[in-house]
Amino acid sequence: MGYGDPVDGGSVTRAHAAELDRGDALAGFRDRFEHGDGDRIYVDGNSLGRLSHDARAAVAATVDEWGGRLVTGWHDWVDLAGRTGDALGAAALGAGPGQVLACDSTTVNLYKLAGAALRPRQGAIVVPADDFPTDRYVLEGLAAAHGRELRLVAGDPVAPLGVDAVAAAADGAALVVLSHVNYRSGALADMAAITRAVRSAGSLVLWDLCHSAGAVAVDLDVAGADLAVGCTYKYLNAGPGSPAFLYVAERHQAALRSPIQGWFSQADQFAMGPRYEPAAGIGRFLAGTPPVIGLAAVMAGAGMLAEAGIGAVRAKAAGLTALAVDLHDERLAGLGFTLGTPRAAADRGAHVSLRHPDAWRICRALIEHANVIPDFRRPDSIRLGLPPLYTRYVDVWDAVDRLAALVADGVHERMPEHAARVT
């Protein structure tokens, strides 16, 4: 059962939201997450997912294995980054085996893949001007180190990236780096169309999947993607600082070489030889020792997603965000809010951005006085992250209800004007 028009043809009621929850095919997954927070409404899973019982059990089992097996555990752990990558590829990324690794952080993986892509290719690096800052920072450093132009693509603050604008910027470029889902607006790019356009221009494309993996359908192989990176602590619920992932299409693996050469990517790892020779296949994009305990949580997240099915997850994300959009129009637009997210479900991921001139103080007031946890992004956005595996329709309704009441009563006006370090 998905979200459609209000059942009474008028306002969106809490009873309607509750009816949607009763028909939710994914409802049973909610009980597999920890919710020891009373009446708190958590709508920040786009920053950090909840702890699942599956992840807790997987981590505990791995700790016990460490305690019992000690170093002999490495006979099973040595290939864990690849096995976990294959599980992610199948459940979340539309990637066949041997193309995904779970390792390092998104930032490090971006550096590795972007650096590898630049080595044999000449031309500029292209990135949207409003892309997530770490992507721009890494690419700025690589551009300086390699003597390349960093070409910024301007875009609409709400609408998805336009294919024509990206294609024009890609002309003569070596590498184009794009976010599949924009971290601020939630706008969802057309991966297949943009990939075709970029490749027609002679460039490689690297997709940042941090805000799409585990929330929307991703099909890297079918789209013809070249490279991708992403994190696992948002919609894959693997915990703070959990290992990220990288994807290198099989057709590119032999020609690319990571700029970070480590012993786990050495062709004959335990020969301990004097010279580095990269391993064949996806393993050449590893570096140091994999974080085994963290990978256990990633594997648990991939398993839950595979069980739910990305199609069902995507459908519910569309329904949850549609409810949030309708409630914005009905309850928030008259209080100074504007919608910072595309209205068409096909054009957005699993979070909704609400813009307001006093967004920071409203966000803090929600946390401190209404027991609602969203997050804030400069300059004026409150993001409601709605992970489908544990978010209910009534959670969306209640969060907006508390938000509207708080702003109407001016509670936020008592909050400090200056943002904290963590927003």
Where are the regions a protein language model picked out?
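Pyridoxal 5′-phosphate
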Residues: 1-423
